[in-house]
Amino acid sequence: MTIFSDIGRYLLMIKGMFSRPENAKMYWKEFIHQCTEIGFGSLGIVAIISVFIGAVSTVQTAYQLVSPLIPPSTIGQIVRDTVILEFAPTLVCIVLAGVAGSRIASELGNMRVSEQIDALEIMGINTKTYLILPKIVASLLMIPMLVALAMALGIWGGRLAATASGILSGSTYDKGLLEFFVPFNVIFALIKAYVFSFIISSVPAFYGYYVKGGALEIGRASTKAVVVSCILILFADYVLSALLLPSAQ
């Protein structure tokens, strides 16, 4: 019954967030702060991962395409679609679940254990709206931007690896990028990014907000939040792919 009670408390938490703010200016400052923490705080790791994802994709694709009947520009097509459809949204969001998700869970957990949340509630502040909603809205704004950046850097990293290792020329790689391009793939990746960003922010917020105990329980809640977020991301990835990709229907 624990899982059903957790789902119920999670839904009640989401419902409790949507109330009229007591001080809109205070909420705006918290929203900007969360945008800085989630967006710019994760920019470095996202950039590094994206470049190497594209580079590894290019090298491994070239290793497998050994048939002389397949034009070299196909490498660019495969890297483009792989990065846009799967690597950029899914892998980057799994990393962000560990980076941003653990921070959200530990921050709220520390506030709960130190009774800061109780103090805010005594002051008449809706802590769900003030502490959780800005994190979710900031994630919905910043994480899709990070995913879009990851797409561009992943494709650029693949081009860099292709030219540096002599697999194929830059013009051949660019030709492959333009061949059989499906714009819906980008839209699909951004849809996944929005769904994943809600999971990354709301699930750790739930585990951090309702933590009980001391420092040990905060660590356990952060770990559980990251694990559950990653599982939900992979499950949502499959569901969205089965529902939205034309070939899967």
What would you call each of these model-derived segments?
Residues 115, 127-147, 221, 225:
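Start (N-cap) of specific transmembrane helices in multi-pass transporter permeases
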Residues 22-48, 227-230:
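Membrane-interface helix starts
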Residues 60-84, 152-194, 202-222, 244-249:
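Membrane-interfacial helix-loop-helix connectors in multipass membrane proteins
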Residues 1-29, 207, 212:
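Short, membrane-interfacial amphipathic segments enriched in basic
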Residues 45, 72-104, 138-147, 180-196:
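Loop-to-helix entry region at the N-terminal start of transmembrane alpha-helices
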Residues 108-133, 215-218:
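Short cytoplasmic-facing helical segments at TM-TM junctions of multi-pass membrane proteins
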Residues 45-62, 239:
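Hydrophobic alpha-helical transmembrane segments of multi-pass membrane transport/permease proteins
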Residues 49-52, 92-97, 133-162, 203, ...:
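Hydrophobic alpha-helical transmembrane segments that constitute the membrane-spanning cores
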